[in-house]
């Protein structure tokens, strides 16, 4: 699990940097009532983040040993970790939407929604799912690992719904 968490953190840093870097641009233009630039900046952010998330997802699915070899050379551990990483990172394709929308909520002065969405993903969904899902699948370990992509998918759907409702209000 430590390797998986490390890979998740290591791989998410560029995406977080990208989304946090776009925040002041979106915020400045929102404050200046330049809504067209807000929308253009968000679209550029979303496209850039989607490209990175897609690349990350492809690497995790096709060549996960690239990440795992950084942390271990033990063949048995690497084999098990490859299986687990593919499950754990299955929804990494969706990270672009989650993080781009969360940071844009902050840029638009709606930090409370952003905090709620961050808590939704890791606290309100992931922790209960880690305890619940193992009871509903034949392999309880699989249930623990699949909790991450299930929580991510639900959180992204919620984030997208809330964001696009807010986005329509921009005009």
Residue ranges of each PLM-predicted region?
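Residue-level signal for functionally critical sites in structured catalytic/ligand-binding pockets
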Residues: 1, 6-10, 73-74, 106, ...
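Small-residue-rich hydrophobic transmembrane alpha-helices
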Residues: 1-64, 95-114
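Small-residue-enriched core segments of transmembrane alpha-helices in multipass membrane transport
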Residues: 6-9, 86, 119-128
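Short runs within selected transmembrane alpha-helices of multi-pass transporters and secretion channels
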Residues: 16-20, 88-107, 113-122, 144-160
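Short alpha-helical transmembrane segments in multi-pass integral membrane proteins
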Residues: 26-91, 134-171
């Amino acid at each position: 699990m430590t390797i998986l968490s490390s890979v998740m953190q290591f791989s998410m840093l560029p995406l977080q940097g990208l989304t946090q870097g776009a925040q002041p641009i979106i915020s400045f233009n929102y404050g200046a009532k330049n809504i067209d630039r807000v929308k253009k900046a968000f679209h550029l952010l979303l496209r850039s983040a989607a490209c990175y998330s897609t690349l990350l997802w492809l690497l995790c699915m096709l060549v996960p040993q690239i990440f795992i070899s950084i942390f271990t050379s033990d063949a048995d551990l690497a084999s098990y970790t490859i299986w687990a990483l593919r499950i754990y990172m299955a929804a990494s394709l969706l990270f672009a939407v989650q993080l781009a929308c969360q940071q844009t909520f902050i840029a638009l002065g709606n930090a409370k929604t952003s905090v709620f969405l961050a808590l939704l993903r890791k606290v309100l969904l992931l922790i209960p799912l880690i305890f619940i899902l193992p009871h509903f699948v034949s392999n309880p370990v699989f249930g623990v690992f699949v909790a991450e992509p299930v929580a991510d998918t639900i959180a992204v759907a919620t984030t997208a719904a809330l964001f696009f409702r807010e986005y329509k209000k921009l005009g």
